[in-house]
Amino acid sequence: MSSGKITQVIGPVVDVAFAAGDRLPEINNALVVYKNDEKKSKIVLEVALELGDGVVRTIAMESTDGLTRGLEVLDTGRPISVPVGKETLGRVFNVLGDTIDLDAPFGDDAERQPIHKKAPTFDELSTSSEILETGIKVIDLLAPYLKGGKVGLFGGAGVGKTVLIQELIHNIAQEHGGISVFTGVGERTREGNDLYWEMKESGVIEKTAMVFGQMNEPPGARMRVALTGLTIAEYFRDVEGQDVLLFIDNIFRFTQAGSEVSALLGRMPSAVGYQPTLATEMGQLQERITSTKKGSVTSIQAIYVPADDYTDPAPATAFAHLDSTTNLERKLVQLGIYPAVDPLASSSRALAPEIVGEEHYAVAAEVKRVLQRYHELQDIIAILGMDELSDEEKTLVARARRIQFFLSQNFNVAEQFTGQPGSYVPVAETVRGFKEILEGKHDKLPEDAFRGVGSIEDVLAKAEKMGF
């Protein structure tokens, strides 16, 4: 194990010099620095660049407070390695695989794997055309998720990405009972804490491993924490042969941390100030999140859209890797429609008759057509009023408004805020409900009866309460 000495500390960047003739650590190797002689408090560094003359530039995974020039640095000879396997379920980790949930830490004999690996080879990959039922109507009908696919939840600030991810975790754990890995990347610590206690109360935590590198962490930790969560998920896929759900909130913060690290390393910025290696870094992460012949990883990633600009390089780079996109729209939030999923902008590779079936596909296509036509007529209605429309157009507008409200529903995880019980709607019920609205069976019911409900039976019950 070779050792060097710290020559420079600039925030999270630490330069380490190794003696002439010593073997230099490889890129991505983990180095360890002990702050004092007792060797109780250590800081992990990751090698990022070789500067020449035996000097390497590293990024710290923790705060560099207390580091001084001349401190000894040890090369571990391998990348950061984190615990894997069934023992990780029910536990909360940081980027280094250390437990942060106050329970007993993992011993040195626990099985660990490095966070840097190659993506599966082409002949190991597997494709599936099975739908993952979420119980959320707007997703299941118009942008269904594939088992083993990649899903992006796009949206600006405060439109409901995290709540939607929490509802998906709740529904999938309750209805499907699969193993989940939740990775919090550069998001609010409070939200992570709330999620942990909610999952503990509901019992879902027993089938979930949680990894956090939140907003207050150095950029190195925020950049690598997604790989820590992915490594845990890969073990369940490759060794245990399981179907795993990987939740990442938020993939934009991964890009943002990469941008900070790139600037700290002195690289010339690219478009909009992002790192020149943006596409490479995103590709290295996304290519590992895939399904193989041994098992599958279904990933659901929240992606923050800066200033609601979808052409920003960060969300635009992520788009290329996804099977389904769920776009959250601020205008729908203003209308009080939750989840605020834009039915026309959201898309899925799975919405094809050979995957979802002829009836589902036909109903989804007709719902989109009606909503698109309503969208086109809104300018006429705003300027001239409803009276200028033909009878056929008036009927279409009335049905479109009912469809728009019926696409909303109350969430189980938001019950404490709304006071309304959440609902899980099976796909068959969803398709039947929208088919009946399109056929005009519920034209006489008030629009308000369709807002925030589950199945079409709930609409009828709500209308009855309203006196219809």
UniProtKB/Swiss-Prot annotation:
ATP binds at G155, G156, A157, G158, V159, G160, K161, T162. It comes from Streptococcus gordonii (strain Challis / ATCC 35105 / BCRC 15272 / CH1 / DL1 / V288). It catalyses: ATP + H2O + 4 H(+)(in) = ADP + phosphate + 5 H(+)(out). This is ATP synthase subunit beta. Pfam families: ATP-synt_ab (PF00006), ATP-synt_ab_N (PF02874), ATP-synt_VA_C (PF22919). It is a peripheral membrane protein. The lineage of its organism: Bacteria, Bacillati, Bacillota, Bacilli, Lactobacillales. InterPro entries: AAA+_ATPase, ATP-synt_VA_C, ATP_synth_F1_bsu, ATPase_a/bsu_AS, ATPase_alpha/beta_chains, ATPase_F1/V1/A1_a/bsu_N, ATPase_F1/V1/A1_a/bsu_N_sf, ATPase_F1/V1/A1_a/bsu_nucl-bd. Keywords: ATP synthesis, ATP-binding, Cell membrane, CF(1), Hydrogen ion transport, Ion transport, Membrane, Nucleotide-binding, Translocase, Transport. It is found in: Cell membrane. Its EC number is 7.1.2.2. F-type ATPases have 2 components, CF(1) - the catalytic core - and CF(0) - the membrane proton channel. CF(1) has five subunits: alpha(3), beta(3), gamma(1), delta(1), epsilon(1). CF(0) has three main subunits: a(1), b(2) and c(9-12). The alpha and beta chains form an alternating ring which encloses part of the gamma chain. CF(1) is attached to CF(0) by a central stalk formed by the gamma and epsilon chains, while a peripheral stalk is formed by the delta and b chains. It comes from the Bacteria. It is an enzyme of class 7 (translocase). Belongs to the ATPase alpha/beta chains family. PROSITE patterns: ATPASE_ALPHA_BETA. GO terms for molecular function: ATP binding; ATP hydrolysis activity; proton-transporting ATP synthase activity, rotational mechanism. Produces ATP from ADP in the presence of a proton gradient across the membrane. The catalytic sites are hosted primarily by the beta subunits. The keyword Ligase does not apply. CDD domains: ATP-synt_F1_beta_C, ATP-synt_F1_beta_N, F1-ATPase_beta_CD. One of its GO terms (cellular component) is proton-transporting ATP synthase complex.
